């Protein structure tokens, strides 16, 4: 990029604003060296870096860079054996502390949120020197004074100094309080000259106290004398202070040596802090401008949505949508020379430079910037009515230089192209220059007030007309860019508003050709149509935003309902779990009671006792209503004796024996026979062709309960259901030991069985079978 172009488009002023957000001289140094890049990957990386810094500001709200100083000169001097001053040591410690805090901040956000790869790489190179920080802070206060705590010797020397000073003051106080002092002394004070304590003595009494004269007043009437009584003490004080100075020098040398040990990692830290300060300055500047990260491309396409000039008041700047490099590669902004066109031209150029420098642009999200190899601009700052030949020549020199270098990777900006010479010749030159630049494939934006160029946008493919809207009421440009509509002269309207006689205006209109008059009317009609279309679009956008707002509101309400549903479901689950635990306790109690009856009575347990116990167990189980759909499905089936059914309240399968009433069936559930209401039955299938014989009694070890359960080939869930039922039956049958055959296979079923046995209350212990019992394919269970 040519420095002249950067100055013309005021990129240097953007850098001045950016510099206001740097926290250290390191960041300012980076900003001063900032130049737009023409490398797409580099630009994308710079923008990503700014984006990451903006994310950190959003998440953390601040960055600890205030204490950062350029300590590179300190590090160099320490590395060659120099002694740093207390202030320089404090700056090293402050920079190290800022580095440590910054590293922790970015590392913490990286671990928690991710997506900060570039900043994390900088943070990873930051050195931590907590011991050095501690030593410096322990030895030097915030004002750069070496503290007593820096060393035991320094503390002792300063104690001596304070003691000697106290003795000196005591002696001098006795002198100035003596009766003779009033006439001998100019003032009853103790002061210091040449680092020695003295008193002001009148000239005529110079020999009254002996000692040494160190100074005199301007008039010579007062002598500052060190009385003989304190000469030795002052000598002792000077000696102690000399030793103090030597000790301070030793402490500073020692601290400087520690800095030298850390010089290399601290130098790398400075470079990383410079990059971080620069990145956060860009992010803060973006926040100030309410700027957005643009997408970037190398195909010469730019689309700035709601773009604003960064150097204008962002609250007052008029946003514009600008597109170039898609359907058209040249924009010709026509219309009167009112100033609005130049602002638009500079906005396009400056936003392009900002994006290529890794800065966010003052535009809306969804904006896109092209990365050009070169940006050229011929923009005159003076927009006077009369333009001299020298001005035309100056512009032509710029244009000749542009034409010498322009290519398909260039953005070219012409302000008032062809102005400053004969209008007819100037318009012809402007058209020829635009044709040349357009033919080379460059992206071009040109402003002109020549009416001849209005037709240019209609006659050339890839070229579009545009204008800056002018408010005839206020006689000012609105700065609103109208793409597709050429500018029109507002001379008659402006003259009328300013009070020019209507007769003169009508005579002037008569001088204008009918063709020109028709063109002006057509342009005015286009402006009205575009304005109406924009108003319609604004209303549609407002309606869409309202719909989006309502959708977001309902989504939030839906999420709240889902959360409430989840909470209630959790409560219900907890209640169900409590009920199930109570049911399990009741089941255990019933089983224990049955076993006690069998052992104590040594008698048959009648069927009605088992049925009664099972019904008590069923009563203890939680009642869960089934879905209406399931009820309807069940009610549609006409139950028949022998049907296989599921008792939903017990979660047990069985067979229908007979219907005992209009809505009750007798159901065979394993060894039990129960009366179940029809609504509690769920049809599974027809029974196999075999007799269903009710079991009348259970005696001791029932013959219908096998001593082993074969689960091989069963699905995992079904196997555990069968295992649970089998263990209940085995307990009721009074078995002390049973065998569970699960096979070896993958071991999943074996593990599931043994995990289930660990939690079953009736299981006393279990083990794998011996070799003659089936080995690891069988689990032997001891029941309580």
UniProtKB/Swiss-Prot annotation:
It is an enzyme of class 3 (hydrolase). Keywords: ATP-binding, DNA-binding, Endonuclease, Hydrolase, Nuclease, Nucleotide-binding, RNA-binding, rRNA-binding. SMART domains: MUTSac, MUTSd, SMR. Disulfide bonds: none annotated. ATP binds at residues 335-342. Belongs to the DNA mismatch repair MutS family. MutS2 subfamily. Homodimer. Binds to stalled ribosomes, contacting rRNA. Endonuclease that is involved in the suppression of homologous recombination and thus may have a key role in the control of bacterial genetic diversity. Acts as a ribosome collision sensor, splitting the ribosome into its 2 subunits. Detects stalled/collided 70S ribosomes which it binds and splits by an ATP-hydrolysis driven conformational change. Acts upstream of the ribosome quality control system (RQC), a ribosome-associated complex that mediates the extraction of incompletely synthesized nascent chains from stalled ribosomes and their subsequent degradation. Probably generates substrates for RQC. The gene is mutS2. It comes from the Bacteria. Residues 709-784 form the Smr domain. This is Endonuclease MutS2. Its EC number is 3.1.-.-, 3.6.4.-. NCBIfam families: mutS2 (TIGR01069).
């Amino acid at each position: 990029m040519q420095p002249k172009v950067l100055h013309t488009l005021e990129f240097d002023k953007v850098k001045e604003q950016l510099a206001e957000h740097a926290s250290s001289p390191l960041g300012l140094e980076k900003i001063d060296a900032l130049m737009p890049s023409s490398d797409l990957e580099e630009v994308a990386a710079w923008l990503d870096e700014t984006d990451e810094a903006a994310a950190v500001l959003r998440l953390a709200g601040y960055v600890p860079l205030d204490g950062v100083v350029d300590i590179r000169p300190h590090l160099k001097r320490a590395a060659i054996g120099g002694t740093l001053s207390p202030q320089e040591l404090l700056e090293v410690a402050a920079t190290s502390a800022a580095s440590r805090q910054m590293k922790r901040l970015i590392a913490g956000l990286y671990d928690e949120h991710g997506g900060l790869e570039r900043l994390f790489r900088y943070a990873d190179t930051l050195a931590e020197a907590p011991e050095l920080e501690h030593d410096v802070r322990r030895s030097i206060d915030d004002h750069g004074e070496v503290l007593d705590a820096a060393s035991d010797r320094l503390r002792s020397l300063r104690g001596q100094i304070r003691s000697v000073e106290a003795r000196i003051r005591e002696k001098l106080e006795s002198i100035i309080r003596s009766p003779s002092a009033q006439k001998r002394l100019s003032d009853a004070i103790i002061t210091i000259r040449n680092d020695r304590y003295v008193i002001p003595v009148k000239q005529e009494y110079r020999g009254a106290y002996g000692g040494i004269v160190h100074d005199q007043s301007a008039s010579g009437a007062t002598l500052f004398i060190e009385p003989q009584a304190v000469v030795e003490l002052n000598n002792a004080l000077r000696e102690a202070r000399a030793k103090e100075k030597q000790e301070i020098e030793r402490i500073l040398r020692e601290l400087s040596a520690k800095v030298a040990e850390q010089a290399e990692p601290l130098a790398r830290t400075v470079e990383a802090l410079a990059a971080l300060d620069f990145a956060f300055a860009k992010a803060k500047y973006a926040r100030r401008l309410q700027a957005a990260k643009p997408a970037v491309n190398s195909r010469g396409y730019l689309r700035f949505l709601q773009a604003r000039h960064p150097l204008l008041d962002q609250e007052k700047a008029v946003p514009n949508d600008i597109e170039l490099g898609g359907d058209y590669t040249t924009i010709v902004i026509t219309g009167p020379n009112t100033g609005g066109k130049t602002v638009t031209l500079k906005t396009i150029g400056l936003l392009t430079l900002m994006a290529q420098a890794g800065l966010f642009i003052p535009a809306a999200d969804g904006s896109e910037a092209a990365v050009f190899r070169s940006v050229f601009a011929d923009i005159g700052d003076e927009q006077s009515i009369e333009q001299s030949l020298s001005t035309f020549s100056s512009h032509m020199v710029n244009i000749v230089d542009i034409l010498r270098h322009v290519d398909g990777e260039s953005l070219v900006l012409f302000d008032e192209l062809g102005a400053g010479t004969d209008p007819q010749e100037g318009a012809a030159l402007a058209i020829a220059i635009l044709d040349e630049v357009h033919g080379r494939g460059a992206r071009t934006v040109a402003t002109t007030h020549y009416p001849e160029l209005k037709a240019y946008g209609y006659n050339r493919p890839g070229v579009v007309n545009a204008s800056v809207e002018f408010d005839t009421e206020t006689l000012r440009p609105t700065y609103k860019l109208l793409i597709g509509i050429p500018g029109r002269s507002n001379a008659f309207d402006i003259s009328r508003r300013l009070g020019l006689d209507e007769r003169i205006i009508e005579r002037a209109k008569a001088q204008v050709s009918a063709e020109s008059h028709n063109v002006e009317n057509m342009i005015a009609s286009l402006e009205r149509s575009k304005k109406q279309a924009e108003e319609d679009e604004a209303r549609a956008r407002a309606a869409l935003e309202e719909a989006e707002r309502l959708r977001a509101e309902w989504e939030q309400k839906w999420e709240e309902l889902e959360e409430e549903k989840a909470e209630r479901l959790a409560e219900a689950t907890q209640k169900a779990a409590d009920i199930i635990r109570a049911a399990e306790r009741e089941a255990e109690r019933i089983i224990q009671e049955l076993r006690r009856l069998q052992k104590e009575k040594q008698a048959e347990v009648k069927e009605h006792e088992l049925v009664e116990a099972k019904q008590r167990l069923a009563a203890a189980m939680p009642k869960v209503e089934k879905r209406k759909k399931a009820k309807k499905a069940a009610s549609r089936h006409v139950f028949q004796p022998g049907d296989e059914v599921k008792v939903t309240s017990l979660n047990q399968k069985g067979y229908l024996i007979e219907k005992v009433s209009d809505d009750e069936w007798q159901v065979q559930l394993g060894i039990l026979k129960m009366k179940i209401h029809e609504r509690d039955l769920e049809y599974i299938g027809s029974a196999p062709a075999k007799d269903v014989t009710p079991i009348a009694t259970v005696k001791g070890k029932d013959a219908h309960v096998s001593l082993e359960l074969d689960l091989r080939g069963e699905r995992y869930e079904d196997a555990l259901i069968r295992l649970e039922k089998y263990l209940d039956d085995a307990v009721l049958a009074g078995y002390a030991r049973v065998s569970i055959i699960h096979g070896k296979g993958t071991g999943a079923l074996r593990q599931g069985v043994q995990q289930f046995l660990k939690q079953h209350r009736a299981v006393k212990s279990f083990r794998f079978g011996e070799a003659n019992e089936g080995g690891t394919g069988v689990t032997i269970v001891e029941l309580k």
